[in-house]
C-alpha cells in the first residue's frame, strides 16, 4: 500500500465552537489522517483549467473513506489544499477516491 499511496495527508473540517461567552467561533480542526498519492496536475490539465478559469493544482488519490466531504480541506506537507468540486469514487466500488484541489497559499505549522 505504501507504494501506491506514498504520501500522508490530514483532512480538516470547519467547525463551530462556543466561545464561552454565549457566542460562536469557527475554526479548522483535524478530522483524520490518511495515506494518499498527491500528484501535481499535468500540463494538459493545467492548460484546460486555465481556459476554464478553474485553478487546479493537484490530483489527490486516497483509499475510499465515506467521511470525506466536499466541505473539507487537506493539509499536505504543511500546505493547505482546498477541494475543487466533489470527491469522486473512481471505480464506483468504494476503493479509491480522487480529489481535485488547489493550494490557497497558506501554510500550517
UniProtKB/Swiss-Prot annotation:
One of its GO terms (biological process) is symbiont genome ejection through host cell envelope, long flexible tail mechanism. This is Head completion protein gp16. InterPro entries: Phage_SPP1_head-tail_adaptor, SSP1_head-tail_sf. Signal peptide: none annotated. Belongs to the Caudoviricetes gp7/gp16 head completion protein family. Functions as a stopper that is part of the head-tail connector and that locks the viral DNA in the capsid. Following tail attachment to the entry receptor, seems to open by a diaphragm-like motion, allowing the genome to exit the capsid through the tail tube to the host cell. During assembly, functions as a docking platform which the preassembled tail tapered by the head-tail joining protein gp17 can bind to. Homododecamer. Interacts with the connector protein gp15. Interacts with the head-tail joining protein gp17. GO terms for cellular component: virion component. Gene3D superfamilies: Bacteriophage SPP1 head-tail adaptor protein. Keywords: Viral genome ejection through host cell envelope, Viral long flexible tail ejection system, Viral penetration into host cytoplasm, Virion, Virus entry into host cell. It comes from Bacillus phage SPP1. It is found in: Virion.
Amino acid at each position: 500500500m505504501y507504494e501506491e499511496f506514498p504520501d500522508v495527508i490530514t483532512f480538516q473540517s470547519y467547525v463551530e465552537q462556543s466561545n464561552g461567552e454565549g457566542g460562536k467561533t469557527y475554526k479548522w480542526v483535524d478530522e483524520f489522517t490518511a495515506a494518499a498519492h498527491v500528484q501535481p496536475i499535468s500540463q494538459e490539465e493545467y492548460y484546460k483549467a486555465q481556459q476554464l478559469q478553474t485553478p487546479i493544482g493537484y490530483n489527490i488519490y486516497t483509499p475510499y473513506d465515506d467521511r470525506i466531504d466536499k466541505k473539507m480541506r487537506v493539509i499536505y506537507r504543511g500546505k493547505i489544499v482546498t477541494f475543487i468540486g466533489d470527491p469522486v469514487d473512481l471505480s464506483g466500488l468504494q476503493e479509491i477516491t480522487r480529489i481535485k484541489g488547489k493550494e490557497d497559499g497558506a501554510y500550517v505549522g
